[in-house]
Curated annotation (Swiss-Prot):
Record's keyword annotation contains Isomerase: no
Family: Belongs to the NR2C2AP family.
Localization per record: Nucleus
Gene that produces this protein: nr2c2ap
A GO cellular component annotation in the UniProt record: nucleus
InterPro entries found in the cross-reference section: Galactose-bd-like_sf
Protein name: Nuclear receptor 2C2-associated protein
Superkingdom of origin: Eukaryota
Main localization of the protein described in the UniProt heading: nucleus
Entry keyword set: Nucleus
Protein task: May act as a repressor of nr2c2-mediated transactivation by suppressing the binding between nr2c2 and its response element in target genes.
Organism of derivation: Xenopus laevis (African clawed frog)
Length: 136
């Protein structure tokens, strides 16, 4: 049975926040479990979310919920051990929908994980994520 590997000790970073308005659209809303909050990236063709775990974790699934029209057609998942260089784990291809989407891949031990959003469905390259979870 897979469970979330996110904890209070998980440190996250994002490529950008819409209009630098972290109080309304900041990274903290990726993980808060509330339906009405979200992370909104600023415009640009390459956006990402980076998570650093306090220790190595086994990961095998990503759960993402976008706002339709502000999703991504191609995502790359990269990970590494502490102080290592990120290496590609998998590519995955979300649908442009509001529904929660689940992506499975071979189990990896990582202390750092990055999801790169390579091409947004939004003309300006913005990404909106209401829910993100990492399971293993």
């Amino acid at each position: 049975m897979v469970t979330s590997v996110l904890s209070r000790g998980t440190v996250s970073r994002v490529s950008s926040v819409l209009n630098r308005d972290v109080k309304q659209f900041g990274k903290q809303f990726l993980f808060d479990g509330r339906e009405e909050t979200c992370w909104n990236s600023d415009q640009g063709s390459y956006q990402w979310v980076l998570m650093e775990f306090p220790q190595n974790v086994l990961v095998s699934q990503i759960h993402l919920q976008f706002q339709g029209g502000f999703s991504c057609q191609t995502c790359t998942l990269e990970g590494c051990q502490k102080d290592g260089e990120l290496v590609k784990i998998a590519d995955f291809y979300p649908e442009d929908t509001n529904a929660l989407q689940k992506f499975a891949f071979s189990e990896q031990s990582v202390s750092k994980l990055r999801i790169s959003f390579l091409n947004s469905t939004d003309f300006f390259g913005r990404i909106t994520v209401y829910h993100l979870d990492v399971l293993g």
